[in-house]
Regions:
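Surface-exposed beta-strand/loop patches in extracellular or lumenal glycoproteins
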Residues: 551-565
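Extracellular polysaccharide-recognition and catalytic grooves
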Residues: 68-72, 132, 136, 158-397
Length: 633
C-alpha cells in the first residue's frame, strides 16, 4: 500500500504542467475533518449494536435493526475500528475490532473464504472485500495488535489469498474449465488490488502474477467511446443492437475503479492508470451538483441509494488517490460527504432521503460499508490542489450524449435530467428503465423531481435489499402505462425504442417512438401499441407530450415529495410547496388523477429511497393527446 503513496506522488508530478504557477493551492484539512467527524458518528453508533453477553454465536457481531440479523460482511468494519483506535487512542475501538473478528469465525470457511451471510447466503465471492478491509487494518494499524491476534489475522489473510487464487470462476476475466459465464466485473477489478497487496505482504509472486493477468485482461473491458467499465451483467461478448454492454455506475465508482486505481498505483502500470483515469472522468459526469450519483440507468440500479450503493464501498479512496492532478475529484468527495451527512439519522446512514419519514428503519450495511470507504481515503496522506474545480454537471452545457450506454444528460438553466435508451439487461428482467425513459429530473432549488426505480420492485439480491413493508408500491419512473388482467405494460421495458435528439434554438427535444410491453417483451392481447412521446427542455422547465395514448393507458408521473411537503392537486395540475419555491405540474391536455397511496398520501419505493405522489394523466377527447408542463418558481 505504501507504493500507492509514492507512485501517486510521481503521477501527480507528471501532470503538474496542467496547473498554472499562479493558481492558489490549499490543504484539504477541512474535508478530512468533516470525514472524520462523520466516521466517528457512524462507528460510535454501530458500537451500540454490537452484541455482548447474549450468546457465543452472537457476541461481537453487529445486529442490524432493519434486517433483524447480523450481516456477514460486517467484518469490513474492522478497518474503521482500527483506524479510530489508532487515531484516538481509545481502547474501545481496538476491543470492538477484536470481538468483531472473533464473531467473523461464524462466516469463515475451511477453504479460507468468508461467506456473505450466516445461513442466508453462502456466496463467498465477497471474500475479496473482506480481505481488502482486513489487509488495510493490519497494514496500517497492525502495531496495535498483540502477536497472537496479528498472526491469526495474517493467517486468515493468507488463506483468503489462496482461496482467490483457486476460484477463477469468481474473479478471472477468462473463461476456463467448466465456467458458464464470467462473474460480475467488480470482483475481478477488486481482486487485482487484493492479490497484489497480499502478494507483497506474504512475498507471494504467484499472487502478484495473477493480479497482473487479471488487470491485463480488464483493459479490454472498457467501452470504446466513453471508457465505461463493463461486465455488470452476463451478456458481455456481444453488444445489444444499440451498441450497449452491461454497465453499472454504482459498482464501477464505488468498488471497481477505486480498486483498479490502487492496483495500478502499486505496480506503476501507467497504461491501466490512464484508462482508469479516463473512466473516472466519464463517471464523474454523472454526479449531480448536490453530490448524488446518478445511477438511474445502470444494470444494477436495484441497489441505487441516490448517494451511492446499498452494499458497495464508496468512491472516495480511489478518487482521492488521484485528486492532486484532478481537483474536481476533491470537490466530488466533499459534496458526497455532505450528502452522506444529510442522509444520516440517529447515527446511521439511510438508503434514501425518505426512509425515516416513511417509517422504514435503516440497514446498517450502508453505514459500515461507507465507513470503510471514508477510512480508505483518510488513510492516504493529504493532497494539495487548486482551490476549487467545479463538477461537470454544475455547468449548463445543454446536452451530452454517451453513446456506449445510449444515454443523454441534459443541463439547461437550473434543470438537470437524464434520458435513457440503455438496453443492456441484467440477469433478471424488469430492472433498470429503458424505452426512452426520463430516468432523472433534478432542479437546483427543488432537488430531485423524478428518480427512476426498478421497473418492478423485487428482492433481486434478497440478503442485500429491504422488502417493502407498506401497502402500496409502484415504479418511480415516468412512463406510459397500461394494466391489463393484472399485467403492467409500459415503455420502460421496451427493447425496440427509437430516440432522436434535436436542438431547437434554446430548447432540447427528444422524440421517442416506443411500445407498451411487459418485462418479457410481451404485448397486450390486442397486439403491439406504438407510443410517441416528446420531451422538450428549456431554462423554464420541461414538457412531456404523448401524441396518442391508447385504450386505458395513461401517463404516470411519480413526483418526488417528502411526506411533510404540502401538495395541492386538481384535475388540471399539482402544486408542490418547496422551501424556496413551488414546483408546478400543469395539464395542458389531459385529466389528472392520483393513484392509491398510503395514509401519508405517498408511495415509497426503497430504491432509491424517495416518497412520491403518483400522478396519472389520462387523455381527454378523441385525439387521445396528453401534454404536461413542469416548472419551478
Amino acid at each position: 500500500m505504501r507504493n500507492i503513496l509514492f507512485v501517486a506522488f510521481v503521477f501527480a508530478l507528471s501532470f503538474s504542467g496542467r496547473v498554472c504557477a499562479g493558481n492558489p493551492v490549499y490543504s484539504d484539512k477541512s474535508l478530512r475533518n468533516d470525514a472524520e467527524k462523520l466516521l466517528m458518528e457512524w462507528v460510535d453508533t454501530l458500537l451500540t449494536y454490537q452484541c455482548e453477553g447474549l450468546h457465543p454465536a452472537l457476541d461481537g457481531g453487529f445486529l442490524c435493526p432493519a434486517c433483524a440479523r447480523i450481516h456477514g460482511r460486517i467484518g469490513d468494519t474492522v478497518l474503521p475500528l482500527m483506524y479510530l483506535a489508532d487515531k484516538t487512542g481509545d481502547d474501545k475501538y481496538l476491543l470492538a475490532a477484536k470481538k468483531l473478528m472473533k464473531w467473523m469465525e461464524n462466516v469463515h470457511r475451511p477453504d479460507g473464504s468468508w461467506m456473505n451471510d450466516v445461513h442466508v447466503s453462502d456466496w463467498s465471492g465477497t471474500t475479496v472485500f473482506a480481505a481488502i478491509a482486513l489487509y488495510e487494518a493490519v497494514h496500517y494499524h497492525g502495531h496495535l495488535l498483540d502477536d497472537s491476534t496479528c498472526n491469526h489475522w495474517k493467517k486468515q489473510l493468507l488463506e483468503a489469498g489462496e482461496f482467490m487464487m483457486k476460484n477463477p470462476q469468481m474473479y478471472s476475466r477468462r473463461m476456463q474449465g467448466n465456467m458458464k459465464r464470467l462473474n460480475n466485473v467488480n470482483y475481478s477489478a477488486s481482486v487485482t488490488y487484493a492479490l497484489q497487496a497480499l502478494g507483497e505482504m506474504f512475498n507471494r509472486p504467484d499472487f502478484k502474477e495473477e493480479a497482473r493477468i487479471v488487470a491485463s485482461d480488464l483493459k479490454k473491458f472498457f467501452t470504446v467511446n466513453d471508457f465505461f467499465l463493463y461486465g455488470e451483467g452476463p451478456k458481455i461478448w456481444t453488444p445489444t443492437k444499440n451498441g450497449c454492454l452491461p454497465v453499472d455506475l454504482g459498482y464501477n465508482i464505488e468498488e471497481s475503479l477505486p480498486n483498479l486505481a490502487y492496483y495500478a498505483l502499486m505496480v506503476n502500470d501507467r497504461e491501466l492508470l490512464s484508462i482508469v483515469e479516463r473512466s473516472m472522468n466519464t463517471h464523474l459526469e454523472f454526479m449531480l451538483p448536490d453530490g448524488a450519483w446518478d445511477n438511474s440507468w445502470g444494470t444494477r440500479s436495484f441497489k441505487w441509494t441516490y448517494w451511492g450503493g446499498r452494499t458497495s464501498d464508496g468512491f472516495m479512496g480511489g478518487y482521492y488517490a488521484m485528486a492532486e492532478q484532478h481537483p474536481a475529484y476533491l470537490e466530488a468527495i466533499r459534496r458526497n460527504i455532505r450528502l452522506l451527512k444529510k442522509s444520516t439519522n440517529n447515527g446511521l446512514l439511510h438508503a434514501g432521503r425518505d426512509y425515516q419519514a416513511s417509517g422504514i428503519p435503516a440497514c446498517i450495511h450502508h453505514t459500515f460499508g461507507h465507513a470503510k470507504a471514508l477510512t480508505a481515503f483518510l488513510e492516504l496522506p493529504p493532497v494539495k490542489a487548486p482551490q476549487y474545480k467545479s463538477l461537470p454537471r454544475d455547468n449548463a452545457y445543454g446536452v451530452k450524449y454517451f453513446q456506449d450506454i445510449r444515454t443523454w444528460l441534459v443541463a439547461e438553466g437550473s434543470w438537470r435530467s437524464t434520458c435513457t435508451g440503455f438496453d443492456a439487461e441484467y440477469k433478471v428482467k424488469g430492472t433498470h428503465p429503458m424505452g426512452g425513459a426520463v430516468s432523472l429530473l433534478w432542479h437546483e432549488q427543488a432537488g430531485p423531481v423524478f428518480a427512476a426505480t426498478t421497473n418492478r420492485y423485487a428482492l433481486i439480491e434478497a440478503p442485500n435489499m429491504q422488502s417493502n413493508s407498506r401497502k402500496y408500491i409502484m415504479s418511480g419512473t415516468p412512463r406510459v402505462e397500461m394494466v391489463q388482467y393484472g399485467t403492467i405494460y409500459s415503455n420502460l421495458d421496451d427493447l425496440d425504442t427509437d430516440i432522436v435528439y434535436t436542438q431547437e434554438k434554446d430548447k432540447h427535444r427528444f422524440h421517442i417512438n416506443t411500445h407498451l410491453v411487459d418485462a418479457d417483451q410481451q404485448t397486450p392481447v390486442q397486439g403491439a401499441f406504438p407510443v410517441t412521446l416528446d420531451y422538450v427542455y428549456s431554462k423554464q422547465g420541461m414538457s412531456i407530450v404523448v401524441d396518442y395514448c391508447p385504450l386505458t393507458a395513461c401517463l404516470v408521473l411519480p413526483v418526488i415529495a417528502a411526506p411533510s411537503e404540502v401538495v395541492d392537486i386538481t384535475s388540471k395540475g399539482m402544486l408542490l410547496q418547496k422551501k424556496e419555491g413551488v414546483l408546478e405540474i400543469i395539464c395542458v391536455n389531459g385529466m389528472l388523477k392520483v393513484a392509491p397511496t398510503d395514509e401519508d398520501g405517498r408511495i415509497f419505493n426503497p430504491v432509491p429511497g424517495f416518497s412520491f405522489v403518483p400522478l396519472q394523466i389520462f387523455p381527454e377527447g378523441e385525439n387521445k393527446k396528453i401534454q404536461i408542463e413542469i416548472t419551478y418558481n
